[in-house]
Amino acid sequence: MIFRSTPIPGAWIVEPEARADERGFFARSWCRREFEARGLAPDFAQVNIGYNFKKGTLRGLHFQTSPWQEVKLVRCTWGAIYDVMVDLRPDSPTYKQWVGVELTEDNHQLLYVPEGCAQGYQTLIDDTEMCYQTSQFYAPDAASGVRFDDPAFGIVWPLPATLISKADRSWPYHSV
């Protein structure tokens, strides 16, 4: 696996190294040894799948509060998404900064989102599925989020947001 750093400390783009032959290819999307060697969360508690019917659907920006803060490892398994993470760690040099990465069924890249960062995505085509591993179990009382259009972050989404849940539209703006 190839690990590419991002401007946000602790966040990585992970590229599986495919071994191809006439049948197709094989690649690892997670390896405890390789993640531990970089000081990254070695274990995950849950794997989630999100399916979206329509291009432009926006989900997020989500995170869990302490003591249920979580690491996420996000991958698009079908279709294409623009995945965004925002650094919400007040002591971080990149506090309130964001990174966006296009994850597709073809590039097989994963985004490693560290604790203390919010994450969300927008679908770039119809019929898109994403899969993400989390280091903590879902804790409804700790579920939180910030608005996708918060001017404190200035996120530039690639498409107009055509479908957003009521819950995601009701997240508060982050204090400036």
Predicted features along the sequence, with ranges:
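Short catalytic/ligand-binding loop motif for oxyanion handling, primarily in non-cytosolic enzymes
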Residues: 26, 121-122
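Conserved SET/PR-domain catalytic core that frames the SAM/AdoMet-binding pocket
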Residues: 104-121
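Non-catalytic, conserved peripheral segments adjacent to functional cores
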Residues: 1-109, 127, 134-176
